[in-house]
Amino acid sequence: MIKLLFMGTPQFSATVLKGLLDNPAYEILGVVTQPDRAVGRKKDIKVTPVKQLALEHGISIYQPEKLSGSQELIEIMGLGADGIITAAFGQFLPTLLLDSVSFAINVHASLLPKYRGGAPIHYAIMNGDKEAGVTIMEMIKEMDAGDMVAKASTPILETDNVGTLFEKLAIIGRDLLLDSLPAYLSGELKPIPQDHSQATFSPNISPEQEKLDWTMSNQEVFNHIRGMNPWPVAHTFLEGQRLKIYEAQLAEGEGLPGQVIVKTKKSLVIATGQGALSLIVVQPAGKPKMSIIDFLNGIGRKLEVGDIIGR
């Protein structure tokens, strides 16, 4: 039985971890995940999906704010793991830790060397890519730059958003890891170096990127909305208040960027730099997420054709 240390945080990671837990060839000695966070207006404490899964299986949990130089690092290195598996962990691994095990493998949600970094799925959708994928790679000190063990891809559908694509890639990543790890550990599967000259990056989404730019084409704004759903969520402004936009559909029509060009009891169409978008699901400031019909029956009632949002 191969003894593993698992490191990850979101549901993507938990899906990979569950695959390892269900496989009798591996024993998870401990998991390292991000600290619990206070979320929402009530500041409720939220544990990571990886921690929740570890709790259910009675696995030791480590949650250092920063792994390097921490007491947890010393404890983790004392577990005697054969190797490390990471998936969307969210921190760099200290060289000391990498050197303490026989192997360290990362499950990364992109077709490397494209989209190294923390938000590959967001950028794949926002940039209008036709496919996304997962790369199983060796861990080195440089971010997502290690040799590649295996790759798998899947089409990005017009109906996909970050949430749906995360779910698909998590399953692909889980299966790809379980399929390739035995051959890698036996030496049968030889890693392939990345072409570093082709590397692109996907840094974490900044608050500035969440704001919609209505001067872009309708396809670009549509992709941007999908690439922010369900987190961190794209937004515009209505009378100085933030209006989050979760879903929209491509529409025809012309007008000034951000201008209301169609308003009925059931639809609201906004002009973009080229074409238009029909808003489907929105969330006004201080209100729950709602359909555009409910929005037009409430706060959106005051909107008129010719009004401009986003200012």
Curated annotation (Swiss-Prot):
It comes from the Bacteria. Its EC number is 2.1.2.9. GO terms for cellular component: cytosol. PROSITE patterns: GART. InterPro entries: Fmt, Formyl_trans_C, Formyl_trans_C_sf, Formyl_transf_N, Formyl_transf_N_sf, Formyl_transferase-like_C_sf, GART_AS, Met-tRNA-FMT_C. Pfam families: Formyl_trans_C, Formyl_trans_N. It catalyses: L-methionyl-tRNA(fMet) + (6R)-10-formyltetrahydrofolate = N-formyl-L-methionyl-tRNA(fMet) + (6S)-5,6,7,8-tetrahydrofolate + H(+). GO terms for molecular function: methionyl-tRNA formyltransferase activity. (6S)-5,6,7,8-tetrahydrofolate binds at S110, L111, L112, P113. It is an enzyme of class 2 (transferase). Keywords: Protein biosynthesis, Transferase. Attaches a formyl group to the free amino group of methionyl-tRNA(fMet). The formyl group appears to play a dual role in the initiator identity of N-formylmethionyl-tRNA by promoting its recognition by IF2 and preventing the misappropriation of this tRNA by the elongation apparatus. Belongs to the Fmt family. This is Methionyl-tRNA formyltransferase. It comes from Streptococcus pyogenes serotype M5 (strain Manfredo). The lineage of its organism: Bacteria, Bacillati, Bacillota, Bacilli, Lactobacillales.
